[in-house]
Amino acid sequence: MSKNPPDLSGGEVKAKQIRFDSDARSALQEGVDQMAEAVKVTLGPKGRNVVLEKSFGAPTITKDGVTVAKEIELEERLPNIGAQVLKEAASKTNDDAGDGTTTATVLAQSVINAGMKSVTSGANPMDVKRGITAAAEEVVTHLRNQSDPVEGKDRISQVATISANNDDAIGDLIADAFERVGQDGVITVEEARGIETYLDVVEGMQFDRGYLSPYFVTDSEEMEAVLEDAYILIYDDEVGNMQDLLPILEKVSQTSNPLLIIAEDVEGEALATLVVNKMRGTLKVSAVKAPGFGDRRQSMLEDIAVLTGGTVISEEKGYRLENATLDYLGQADRVTIDQDNTTIVGGEGSEEEIEARVNQIRQQIANSTSDYDQEKLQERLAKLAGGVAVLNVGAATEPEMKAQKALVEDALSATRAAVDEGVLPGGGVAYLRALESIEEVEVENEDQEIGVSIVREALEAPLRQIAENTGHEGSIVVQKVKDGEGDFGFNARTEEYGDLLDQGVLDPTKVTRSALENAASVGGMLLTTEAVIADLEDEDDDDGGGGGGGGMPAGGAGGMGGMGGMGGMM
């Protein structure tokens, strides 16, 4: 017989286990500790490696905290809930700031463990949480006030180097990328085909549409069509009838300038005539399809028009192709078209109009709630205001490639965060210097004061862990740094004390702030948890193990129920 109770429809309801009060919190704490112990060994420049088994392919060796956290799923259901909640704090920090997952994990573990002790001793969980929240808010305000703006290539390189586990080469490459494409540019990370790590920069506007016919090629070795001082015709419909295109072609041919046609499509008679004119040398011309789809296509055509000083010829707006004049056309110093991409360099659009368009897109990014829309808008912004840089990461082996790529992505995200909100002295020093700000927190009772003390203790945890990963006694290092002032701290890379800002040991303010905010949030949430409900643990019983058909349904149903429960957890 099944152990699960029947529901009214004749099926089975999966039985649940329920834990209350201290039993619930201790089960969650067990999972938090297992997660934190695996992640926090990666903290700092001398953090240790973690090896991750993969179901296929080679194992991954990494020092990236979020990569370790994402791999963790515990066997026991209740502790696993605690681990997943802590994972959420780490992931949220990574989403917000692009780095700081390990710091958030260390802070959260300290808050949770100290909080659990106080609640078990009889403190009011809600008041403890209020104290934690008040103290964290005060520290965040202090961090923002102490933040130092990041300006100049050298400072950007320092931040990127720290985030890349002190790899100077990666730090310099990221700084070069920011210098080349600017803050609004798009910087992506790709796997290189060889062992070298290098930077590719596409200046100007590039979109993923190639020539419509190979007969448009002007450089047969590179298989590219290169148009110098080109006119650009931007049309939001298909071109099939050559008669519509003929008037503007005649006007362009009189100038001897080449022409790029960007349209929804160019086909049939129109395409054939363009190819013939190109082959005869009558007109230097090339044609490509418009980038994007739907409303996004229209927006991208408008971007091209603003960049080149042209007009989108659209019958919806009263413009007809057969009536087009040279004033409708955009212009650019150089257009390069290959089989897959078109690049426009030196568009002759008005700087004022380009700036207005850039500000409009920035506003759309700020108002958008969709990550996908924000990403696409950021790409458009980069093509107008900056450019696109690609960091190609090379390595000798696949595991090294994966680890190196994750490292570069982390460093890039942290550098963006630093450019956004500035930097603070690294190595956990910023948290220690913020201890004085907690003294100003006003509390209403003793339990809230306990919450403030919990944050006070947690602020020491990152430096303590960095020191221990380096092989030093954490308490001694923390006390020596507390005895110092300002940017004085412990440089874990050199294992010496000194002015960390002067030594280039920096942390982005956004990372430092987000790590504390998310740690305080998840800590307060777990402290105020009074019940946990989860599926029962899977049991190895003999109900489904007997021979014959009778055992099969019972065993199958039990197995499926267990899988369903795990699905709900993930």
From Swiss-Prot:
InterPro entries: Chaperonin_Cpn60_CS (IPR018370), Cpn60/GroEL (IPR001844), Cpn60/GroEL/TCP-1 (IPR002423), GroEL-like_apical_dom_sf (IPR027409), GROEL-like_equatorial_sf (IPR027413), TCP-1-like_intermed_sf (IPR027410). Keywords: ATP-binding, Chaperone, Cytoplasm, Isomerase, Nucleotide-binding. GO terms for molecular function: ATP binding; ATP-dependent protein folding chaperone; isomerase activity; unfolded protein binding. It comes from the Bacteria. Its main location: cytoplasm. It is found in: Cytoplasm. Its EC number is 5.6.1.7. One of its GO terms (biological process) is protein refolding. Residues 545-570 have a biased composition (Gly residues). Transmembrane segments: none annotated. It holds the Pfam family Cpn60_TCP1. The keyword Lipid biosynthesis does not apply. It is an enzyme of class 5 (isomerase). Residues 537-570 are annotated as: Disordered. ATP binds at residues 42-45, 63, 99-103, 427, 507. The keyword Nucleotide-binding applies. One of its GO terms (cellular component) is cytoplasm. It catalyses: ATP + H2O + a folded polypeptide = ADP + phosphate + an unfolded polypeptide. Belongs to the chaperonin (HSP60) family. Forms a cylinder of 14 subunits composed of two heptameric rings stacked back-to-back. Interacts with the co-chaperonin GroES. Together with its co-chaperonin GroES, plays an essential role in assisting protein folding. The GroEL-GroES system forms a nano-cage that allows encapsulation of the non-native substrate proteins and provides a physical environment optimized to promote and accelerate protein folding. This is Chaperonin GroEL 1. It comes from Salinibacter ruber (strain DSM 13855 / M31).
